[in-house]
Structure formats: C-alpha cells, structure tokens
A protein has these predicted regions:
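Gly/Pro/Ser/Thr-rich low-complexity, intrinsically disordered segments predominantly at protein N-termini
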Residues: 1-187
C-alpha cells in the first residue's frame, strides 16, 4: 500500500502558489483572482475595517493572507479579509510567509467558485482554531452569516446592521451600504 505524502505549510510556502490552501496536509485549490462581485465586496470591507482599525489603533487588517491554523497535519487557510488585534499580534508567530496563528475576525465572501457550504466548513475550522468571529457574506442572497464559538449561527439581511461585537467594539456597518456596492453590477 502506498503511503500518501502530507504537504506541510512550509512546503506550500515554497510552492508560492496563491491558488492553493492546505487542509489537514492535503492541497485544496482556491479561485484566484476573485470575480468582480467578490473583489468589490472584499475591497469595500477592507476599506471600512482599515479606517476603523487605524482610527482606534486596534491591530491590522489583511487581504488574502494565509494563516497556519493547525499543525500535524498542517492546515493553512486564507480568508478574503481578516483582522488581527494588537494583543493577538504579539502571540502570533510573524515571519515571511504565512501567519502562524489565527485572526480575530475572518471574512469569507461566497461566489460561484466558493459556495456557502464550503465557506460554512471553513468558518467551523476558523472557530476550532481559535478565531473569535467569522462573517460569511452571501452576495447572491444579500445576507451575512455570523459564526461565533459555541453560539448558534446568526443570519443578517441587507436591512440589518453588522457590528464588530467584542472583537471590534464600536464598529458598525449597515448591510444596505455593503450590498449597494453591487447595484451597478447586476446586469
């Protein structure tokens, strides 16, 4: 019987491939570059978070950065947008390549190549690794699903306001503003 080689985070880094993530040692293809809708929402969310985080000196906002969530076998995931608090920055191992640690907030945006079922599974992985809050954005249905440890998933519609809870206290974003970014792309 052949022994299967499990890929490590270091091997994935050496490959230099942005189109792969690592799940329990197995390479998983991811879509890159993003389509227009996903790119628009990721840019908008990054801008909103960046402004808030910088104004309050809370930490860092990242776009498509790889996080080594688990070891032996390794799992590396790259959310569309993420936030790492100052406190967590001091405990995460930062060096070239992937961040060895987890984000406080991970944001995933659904698209044809990233279905909600896949993103729900990723949200569970982030939470199991220690992420405090995951937003899964569904542009097609104009909804955002909020995942938190040991809490039921909450679904917000475009008439609701998204907030940063205890991860980004004081941050709010009316979802009508977020989804308005897609209005001129509906054709």
């Amino acid at each position: 019987m052949a022994v299967r080689h499990l890929v490590t985070a270091r091997e994935l880094e050496r490959m230099g491939r942005a189109d792969l993530e690592l799940v329990r040692g197995e390479l998983v293809p991811v879509m890159t570059p993003a389509g227009e809708q996903r790119g628009t929402l990721a840019a908008f969310l990054t801008a909103e978070l960046w402004a808030f985080v910088r104004a309050h000196d809370l930490g860092r906002v990242y776009v498509e950065v790889g996080y080594k969530l688990f070891s032996d076998p390794d799992t590396v995931r790259g959310p569309d947008v993420s936030f790492v608090s100052r406190k967590r920055q001091t405990t995460a191992k930062r060096r070239r390549g992937f961040i060895h640690g987890v984000p406080d907030l991970a944001i995933e945006i659904a698209s044809a190549d990233k279905p909600m079922t896949q993103l729900t599974a990723k949200a569970v992985e982030y939470l199991e690794a220690g992420t405090l809050l995951v937003w899964v954005v569904d542009p097609k249905r104009r909804k955002v699903r909020l995942h938190r440890p040991r809490q039921p998933v909450r679904t917000l519609s475009q008439t609701d306001t998204l907030d940063g809870a205890d991860v980004l206290p004081g941050f709010t974003l009316p979802l009508s503003r977020l989804f308005a970014e897609l209005e001129d792309q509906s054709g």
